A protein has these predicted regions:
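Residue-level detector of alpha-helical segments with a strong bias toward transmembrane helices
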Residues: 89-91, 161, 166
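Conserved phosphate/anionic-ligand binding catalytic regions in large, soluble enzymes, centered on
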Residues: 150-163
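C-terminal accessory segment of soluble enzyme catalytic cores
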Residues: 147, 166-218
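Cytochrome P450 core scaffold surrounding the K-helix E-X-X-R motif
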Residues: 51-59, 163-176
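Compositionally biased, intrinsically disordered low-complexity regions enriched in proline and serine
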Residues: 6, 19, 78, 155, ...
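N-terminal lobe of the biotin/lipoate ligase/transferase fold
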Residues: 1-140, 148, 216-218
Length: 218
């Protein structure tokens, strides 16, 4: 099927139910696989929800209800005060194989570079995620959990941008760590989206912010 779009798309979904959004992601993955749409970035917030991935360890969330998914990683929390980014991207193949690790490193770099535009020095370390600070003041401010279907990515990145998100993490061991490691950074949501679009565009070609209806126009 012909891709009639002239650029990659960035779409702000506002707040959306987790399972509804997961269904939407999978539809976009199918459409990206047949080249009827370009690469798409979804920006959004979920109502409070706990999810877990392929490294699921029930000891990290006890009796809390969680949604089990096909993404990488262990249990995490999504809710108000967090910007979620789901990149529906066709990953380039290297020697006939999908280079997932290089893709993850690239996404980490995009988040780090975007945060740097606001004066935050973020980094990756031995533990999963993106961190700011040093020593006892070191806090995890962004998490990543991806799934790849036939070379197209979905699920993605969450960045904590409001203090209220920390309460949700306090009920679990996020990614197997004590919840006290979680932190947040105060950044205007729209400003952060614009910074991310700019850096994603440098890495994957230009993205333009469009309305949701753009995806359904004939």
């Amino acid at each position: 099927m012909e891709n009639r779009y002239t650029s990659n798309l960035a779409i702000d979904l506002g707040q959306i139910d987790y399972l509804e959004c997961l269904k939407f992601q999978k539809d976009l993955v199918s459409r990206r696989l047949n080249n009827s749409i370009p690469d798409v970035l979804l920006f959004l917030e979920h109502p409070p929800v706990y999810t877990t991935g392929r490294r699921d360890d029930p000891s990290n969330y006890g009796s809390i209800d969680v949604i089990k998914t096909e993404r990488g990683g262990d249990v995490t929390y999504h809710g108000p005060g967090q910007l979620v980014i789901y990149p529906i991207l066709k990953i380039w193949e290297k020697e006939g194989k999908i280079d997932v690790r290089s893709f993850v490193v690239k996404l980490e770099g995009i988040v780090i570079k975007s945060l740097a535009t606001f004066g935050f020095e973020a980094s990756v370390g031995d533990e999963p995620g993106i961190w700011i600070g040093n020593g006892k003041e070191k806090k995890k401010v962004a998490s990543m959990g991806l799934a790849i279907e036939n070379g197209v990515s979905y699920h993605g990145i969450s960045i904590n941008i409001g203090k209220e998100v920390l309460e949700g993490f306090s009920r679990i061991n996020p990614c197997g760590m004590d919840s006290s490691v979680m932190g947040y950074i105060e950044i205007d949501r729209d400003d952060l989206i614009n910074a991310l679009i700019s850096v994603f565009s440098e890495e994957f070609g230009p993205f333009e912010m469009k309305s949701l209806t753009t995806l359904w126009k004939s």
